[in-house]
Regions:
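N-proximal low-complexity "stem/linker" segments adjacent to membrane-targeting elements
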Residues: 1-23
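Active-site-proximal specificity loops/subdomain of glycosyltransferases
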Residues: 40-93
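Catalytic-site signature of metal-activated, phosphate-bearing donor transferases
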Residues: 71, 105-331, 335
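Short beta-strand-to-loop acidic/aromatic patch adjacent to the donor-nucleotide binding site
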Residues: 90-104
Length: 350
C-alpha cells in the first residue's frame, strides 16, 4: 500500500481538498502533522478513516525543541513516519508531500516495480497561475526543453530561458521511497546517512501536481502563512529576490490591507502566467485532480492503531536521530517507542 506524510498549516477547505485529491490519486493512508492549532481541521482529520493526525504545533510533540524553520519541522516529521513504517508490513511506499501537492502516478505500475527499486522520482507539474480564484485546477505547466524555453524568452513570456524562471515553485519534484532505516526522506529527494542525495527511478507515469499560487488570493494566503511560520524559507536562487521582497514587506508593520495590496502587486509583476500564450503553444498538460482514479484501500484498524500509538510515544523522544541516523540509533528509538520486534506490524526491517 501507499502512505504519505505531510506537515500542514492550511484552512479546512484546503485540507479537505488535499486529502480527497491524494486519496483519489493512489494514496491509501495519510499521516498529517498539524503545524498550527486548528480545532476544525483536527476534528475533520481525526474522523477520517484514511488519515492519522498528529498535533505538532507545540511542546506536546516537540518538547522544548521545536525547530524554528518549517522545512526542518517537515524533515523531522517525515523521517519519524518513515522510521515507524519500517516496522509496518502494510506500507510499501511513503511519499512526502505538501498540502498544495497531489501525487500523479500509475499505482499499478508502481506496485509492479522490482523490490530493489527503493526510490521513485515524481516530476513536477505546476498549476498555472491566473487571477481567478474559482478557476478549475486543470491546466499544468510541465518542465520545458532548452529550445522551448528559448522560444518563451523570445516571446517575452520569461526573462531567462530556464525552468527555474518558468516555474514559480520547485523544479526538483518530489520522491517516494520504500521505508528503510538507511534512507532519509528529504523535502524533495531522499539522502543517505552522509546526507548525499540518492537517485530515484523516473518514468512518464510518475509525477506530482503542484498547486503553487494558482491565483492572486492564493499567493497572498500562501506567503502570509509561510512567513509567519518561522524564518524565511529556503528557495532556489531564481526566487530569492522575490521572497526577500515579500519578507521585507510583511515585516514593515504596515496595515494588513496595504500589505495584501502590495503582495497582489508583486503577484501581478512576478507570478501571474501568460496562460493564453502557453495554451497556444501546446505547453500545458490537462489533469483533473478531483477526478478520482483510485479508491483508497483500507489499512487494518489494528495497524492504524499501532501506528497512532507509536506516534504518541515518539512525542516524548529526542527526535534528532530520526533525521539523519545512524540507523542503530533510530532502531533503539523505535524499540523504545513501539517495543522490540514481533510478527505482524513490527515484523519488517529494510
Amino acid at each position: 500500500m501507499l502512505a504519505s506524510v505531510s506537515t500542514v498549516k492550511a484552512s479546512l477547505p484546503d485540507v479537505e481538498r488535499f486529502v480527497s485529491r491524494n486519496l483519489g490519486s493512489g494514496i491509501d493512508h495519510m499521516v498529517v502533522f498539524l503545524d498550527a492549532e486548528q480545532p476544525d481541521v483536527l476534528a475533520h482529520l481525526t474522523a477520517h478513516p484514511h488519515v492519522s493526525v498528529v498535533e505538532a504545533s507545540d511542546d506536546r510533540w516537540w518538547g522544548a525543541a521545536r525547530p524554528d524553520g518549517l522545512n526542518r519541522r517537515q524533515h523531522f516529521n517525515a523521517n519519524v513516519v518513515k522510521a515507524l513504517l519500517t516496522r509496518a508490513d502494510w506500507a510499501d511506499w511513503l511519499f512526502h508531500i505538501d498540502s498544495d501537492e497531489v501525487v500523479h502516478l500509475d499505482r499499478d505500475r508502481l506496485e509492479q516495480l522490482p523490490a530493489d527499486t527503493g526510490i521513485v522520482h515524481l516530476a513536477p507539474l505546476e498549476l498555472v497561475s491566473r487571477d481567478d480564484d474559482d478557476a478549475a485546477p486543470t491546466a499544468y505547466k510541465r518542465l520545458l526543453s532548452d529550445d522551448e524555453l528559448v522560444l518563451l524568452k523570445a516571446l517575452g513570456v520569461v526573462d531567462r530561458a530556464a525552468n527555474e524562471e518558468y516555474f514559480h515553485g520547485h523544479v526538483g519534484g518530489k520522491s517516494g521511497l520504500r521505508p528503510a532505516l538507511d534512507v532519509y526522506s528529504g523535502i524533495h529527494k531522499p539522502t543517505d546517512e552522509q546526507r548525499e542525495t540518492l537517485p530515484g527511478f523516473a518514468a512518464p507515469w510518475l509525477g506530482v501536481l503542484h498547486l503553487e499560487s494558482p491565483s492572486r488570493e492564493a499567493f497572498v494566503r500562501k506567503w502570509r502563512n509561510l512567513l509567519t511560520s518561522g524564518p524565511r524559507p529556503k528557495v532556489r536562487r531564481a526566487r530569492t529576490d522575490l521572497v526577500t521582497a515579500i519578507d521585507t514587506l510583511i515585516n514593515l508593520r504596515l496595515p494588513a490591507e496595504q500589505v495584501d495590496g502590495l503582495l497582489g502587486d508583486l503577484y501581478e509583476r512576478h507570478v501571474r502566467d501568460d496562460v493564453d500564450t502557453l495554451e497556444r503553444l501546446g505547453f500545458l498538460e490537462r489533469v483533473d485532480p478531483d477526478a478520482a482514479a483510485y479508491a483508497p484501500r483500507e489499512v487494518a484498524r489494528a495497524d492504524v492503531d499501532e501506528l497512532e500509538h507509536a506516534l504518541a510515544r515518539v512525542a516524548g523522544q529526542d527526535k534528532e536521530a530520526y533525521r539523519h541516523g545512524p540507523p542503530d540509533r533510530v532502531e533503539a528509538l523505535l524499540d523504545d517507542a513501539v517495543g522490540r520486534r514481533r510478527p505482524g506490524w513490527l515484523g519488517r526491517r529494510r
